Amino acid sequence: MFFREVFWEVDLMKRFALEKLIEWKDKQNRKPLIIRGARQVGKTWLMKEFGRTCFEKVAYVNFDNNKRLEQVFEGDINIDRILLAISIETGVSIDAKNTLLIFDEVQEVPKALSSLKYFCENAPEYAIVAAGSLLGVALHKGTSFPVGKVDFMDLYPLTFLEFLYALGEERFANVLQSDDTDMITMFKTKYIERLREYYYVGGMPEVVKTYVNSKDFKQVREIQKNLLNYYRQDFSKHAEVSLVPRLNLVWDSIPMQLAKENKKYIYGQVSKGSRAKDFELALQWLLDCGLIHKVQRVGKVVLPLKAYLDLDAFKVYLLDIGLLIAMTDLDAQVIIDGNRIFTEFKGALTEQYVLQQLIASEGIEPYYYSTSNSSGEIDFMIQGKTSIIPLEVKAEENLRAKSLKAFCEKYHPKYAVRTSMSDYREQEWMTNIPLYNIYKIREYADK
């Protein structure tokens, strides 16, 4: 993977997403780009940094509470009129070759979102990126969407690798991306130390920035709690009044659902006696906002996995491991040093970490597998180019993989992976990848 250097005030940070934006800029038949992601994952910063590093000029507009710009989009869409208004609003002389147009919080003005269709059809030479934290929710309210006229990119919290770069440990991160397993194993203790820090801090940009600048876990927790409060405020501000209590119940139930040995989401554990129909809308709202991830069960081990989903069985994870730990009020020392009474939930946190890395760093959509009676569960199933890869997650150096071995004996997959704190290990039927280098699973998916 390649990176471009970007700066967080005085701190060096690198994000994979910037390279994706550069690829989009250079793409033939480029369409306006919509960046999707939860609130506070860094969409605004990324768009501005993209403009700063790749364009001569940036015309940035935020549609949140901007009545003047809202009026510009009333009536028929006129591209020249819109460009003139944005130029006046921002003080930027706009030209197609050298200017990046940024539409932030675009869901606040539905016709601004609709205008992307007209830019695509009538003015494709202009580079436009748009973002909105609650875009999915806005669409459910009937906002007209420019179907087929936009490109998409998803943004997530920082990955573990990006976390290392944010800490200024560039050479350390570069080694992790190499194929030098001996060198990686040599520094295993340090990788595990940093990984446990990442478990607590997570990847929300403001939280990472706070940790990089202060190394103070108390300040980290304060920022995390603030973010969690912001999300609850969004529930009250943007959801239907009748849905808000259910959103809070579903949100609060996530740590409890993950703490179960069988992590299948059970509606009855959200509220006593409740059923799917009571909380399906709340769950979908959180999905649309990017605040949770939903991992579906597959009932067959055949390609394509998506054709064999069990729609009634799924697991739910939070968008960020640091926020998950903040919701449980676990102290930093429990995570960093380990604790004998913190063994059961450690498995849930490790699954959360692995899922987050698979989705954010590699764009992998994982599933999980279990038999009808929920025995012999495989934590994640990954669809590769020509094969299905079972992935078993272990929190420590546990080399046992009973479920994975039974699965392999039954289905004989081309590749099988266990990820744990143990070193690289190739066995006849399985490969162990260290948790801190789970990115390497992409090599198997691409084979």
Identify the meaning behind each predicted range:
Residues 65-97:
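Short glycine-rich substrate-engagement loop in P-loop NTPases that contacts/grips substrate
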Residues 46, 50:
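Hydrophobic positions on the alpha1 helix immediately C-terminal to the Walker A/P-loop
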Residues 43:
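Conserved lysine of the Walker
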Residues 102, 127-133, 154:
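Structural recognition of the conserved hydrophobic beta-strand(s) that form the central parallel beta-sheet
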Residues 2, 6, 139-260:
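Interdomain motor-coupling "hinge/lid" segment immediately C-terminal to the ATP-binding subdomain
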Residues 14-28:
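Pre-Walker A adenine-sensing motif
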Residues 209-377, 382-383:
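Accessory nucleic acid-recognition modules appended to NTPase machines
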Residues 358, 378-397, 416:
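Conserved catalytic cores of phosphodiester-cleaving nucleases, focusing on short active-site segments
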